[in-house]
Amino acid sequence: MTSFVGLLDLPGIRWRPSPTDVDSSRETRELPVALARLLEPVDGLVAIDGGLHIRGARSRLPWHDLHPVWKGERVLSILYDAVTPEDVPFAANCMGDQFLLRDGAVVQLIAETGELEHVDASLESFLQRSAARDPEIWLGLRYLEQFELEN
């Protein structure tokens, strides 16, 4: 079993769910093992100064719950041809691009075009590199910063 970079290790945490936001009775068995393990201690969060949203699997909050975009009323595999029902949309950046787990690897769905780009070989390496990459470019954080300055 590999050691995981935990969600709380990500820099710039802006939000994380309170205990009342989490429905502990919800099952996580359908999730890939790595994602279920990652979400066990903290059911997702918003980190990297708002640039990265890791969705929760047991969330009571519709905007934070991964199930609607995975298997529910906003399922990405219907909205985008390149996304399959097996892809798990576990995260999004501040520009609306989605990060999907596909056969253990992380791919990025470019929301504007519907194209997929390979990002990392595993969820673990995705998290490790998330903190090291330039978030202004990689996550589109410069646009979020500009919006915050102007509003």
Which ranges hold each PLM region?
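Low-complexity intrinsically disordered segments
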Residues: 144-151
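Generic alpha-helix signal with a bias toward terminal, lower-confidence helices
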Residues: 20, 51, 64-66, 102, ...
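Short polybasic amphipathic segments
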Residues: 98, 104-109
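Compact, glycine/acidic-enriched structural inserts
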Residues: 107-143
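A surface-exposed partner-binding patch
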Residues: 1-101
